[in-house]
Structure formats: C-alpha cells, structure tokens
C-alpha cells in the first residue's frame, strides 16, 4: 500500500472527517461567543464598574511616564510593563460562556440519544449445548 493511499484511507475515515467538521463549526461558534462577550456582556460589566472598557483594566508594573494617557494601548506603547487583568477576565468569561453552552449542547444530545438496547446474550457453543443435553439425559 503506497503512502498516498494510506493517507487517503486515514483522512477519509469517519472520525477524521467528523473532527474536521467539528473544528470548523467550533471556530465559527467561537466567533459568535466572542461577539456576545465583547459586544453584549462586557459593556454591561464595564458600565457597572464605572463606564471604562473592561479590557482597559490593568495595573502598571512601573511608573507611567508623564503625558501618557492612562489607557492600556498607550501605556503598552510607552513600554511600561502591565498586568492586564481586564483582558484576562474577558477571556475567562468568554471561556466560561462557551463551556456552559457546550455543556448544554452535550446534555441535550445525550438526552435525545436513544438508549441502545442491551445486546442479546451470545449463544453458547455447540459443545456446551451437547454437554447440557447429556447432563439432562443422565438426570432422567
């Protein structure tokens, strides 16, 4: 079997194709969740915490030079090291929302999945059947 035919057999297996479709749909779904977090949830959280964009919450690890605005991008451009906890919290919230939605989807999928009936017990081998018949005949 040639290398190309082995690769073709591997790539066209159901699991690989299913995984590829899942990754593509997951990437598109991730963009939707990013939009929900960044455009809908975080502005509300920012309004609760004083109207500042939540992504701009940071702690400067060195003194900010005079004349540099107190905004994350400006401080980073000035070369000041920062602890950008607002951006981190946004990403954590994004992950939690995505994980919760995936949990709900898996839970619904498991609910819709029909319970497979238990497989019928395997028939005993012919030798066992013959030995049982002999045993039953001797008991009579």
From Swiss-Prot:
The chain crosses the membrane at residues 16-36, 86-106. Disulfide bonds: none annotated. SUPFAM superfamilies: Gated mechanosensitive channel (SSF81330). It is found in: Cell inner membrane. One of its GO terms (cellular component) is plasma membrane. It comes from the Bacteria. The keyword Zinc does not apply. Keywords: Cell inner membrane, Cell membrane, Ion channel, Ion transport, Membrane, Transmembrane, Transmembrane helix, Transport. GO terms for molecular function: mechanosensitive monoatomic ion channel activity. It is a multi-pass membrane protein. Pfam families: MscL. Belongs to the MscL family. Homopentamer. HAMAP family: MscL. PANTHER family: LARGE-CONDUCTANCE MECHANOSENSITIVE CHANNEL (PTHR30266:SF2), MECHANOSENSITIVE CHANNEL MSCL (PTHR30266). NCBIfam families: mscL, PRK00567.1-4, PRK13952.1. Channel that opens in response to stretch forces in the membrane lipid bilayer. May participate in the regulation of osmotic pressure changes within the cell. This is Large-conductance mechanosensitive channel. The gene is mscL.
């Amino acid at each position: 079997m040639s290398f190309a035919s082995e690769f073709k057999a591997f790539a066209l297996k159901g699991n690989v194709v299913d995984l590829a479709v899942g990754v593509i749909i997951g990437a598109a779904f991730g963009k939707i969740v990013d939009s929900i977090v960044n455009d809908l949830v975080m502005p509300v959280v920012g309004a609760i915490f004083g109207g500042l964009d939540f992504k701009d919450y940071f702690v400067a690890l060195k003194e900010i030079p005079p004349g540099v605005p107190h905004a994350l991008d400006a401080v980073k451009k000035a070369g000041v090291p920062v602890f950008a906890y607002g951006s981190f919290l946004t990403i954590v919230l994004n992950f939690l929302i995505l994980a919760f939605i995936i949990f709900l989807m898996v839970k619904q999928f498991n609910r819709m999945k029909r319970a497979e009936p238990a497989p019928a017990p395997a028939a005993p081998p012919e030798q066992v059947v013959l030995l049982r018949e002999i045993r039953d005949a001797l008991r009579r």
